[in-house]
């Protein structure tokens, strides 16, 4: 996850989510990243808040963060694009095969040099001294436009996300 990557880079990370346990929590727990339920009390002066794709301005933490000038806010895809610029990045997009391609590519690249990755199944890490970053690129709501990778792979193209895209 993006939280594990930011933690791997040495930054202090905490997060809020729904109460239901989800398998993606395990790597967060392994890194001792605290996860709490939503409360505007979690937002403080000087915080950096990354807003996940599943939440909007009606969320109490998002609402408070967006109202405070001293809190820097990023939508998930914006922060990911900013982070990717710090590495030689490879973005994997397409209708099918993104997760598999991203996983295989990051593994092969890590045999040559330290390589971070972010996969759509919620896994991600950023080994120390990483030079490369392989990310699964989400085309939903044009989020991929926030990424400026040095290399891009498109596995295939089909009509997808028909709630947003009306045609190809």
Question: Residue spans of the language-model regions?
Answer:
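N-terminal leader/targeting and accessory segments in enzymes
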Residues: 1-79
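Phosphate-binding loop of NTP-binding sites
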Residues: 5, 57-168
């Amino acid at each position: 996850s993006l939280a594990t990557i930011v933690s791997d880079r040495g930054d202090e990370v905490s997060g809020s989510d729904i109460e239901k346990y989800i398998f993606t929590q395990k790597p967060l727990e392994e890194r001792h990243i605290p996860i709490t339920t939503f409360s505007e009390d979690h937002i403080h002066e000087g915080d950096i808040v990354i807003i996940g794709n599943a939440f909007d301005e009606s969320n109490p933490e998002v609402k408070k963060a967006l109202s405070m000038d001293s809190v820097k806010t990023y939508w998930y895809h914006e922060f990911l694009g900013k982070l990717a610029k710090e590495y030689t990045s490879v973005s994997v997009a397409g209708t099918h095969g993104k997760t598999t391609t991203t996983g295989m590519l990051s593994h092969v690249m890590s045999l040559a040099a330290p390589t971070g990755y972010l996969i759509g199944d919620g896994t991600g890490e950023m080994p120390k001294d990483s030079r490369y970053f392989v990310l699964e690129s989400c085309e939903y709501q044009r989020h991929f436009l926030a990424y400026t990778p040095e290399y891009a792979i498109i596995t295939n193209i089909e009509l997808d996300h028909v709630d947003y895209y009306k045609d190809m």
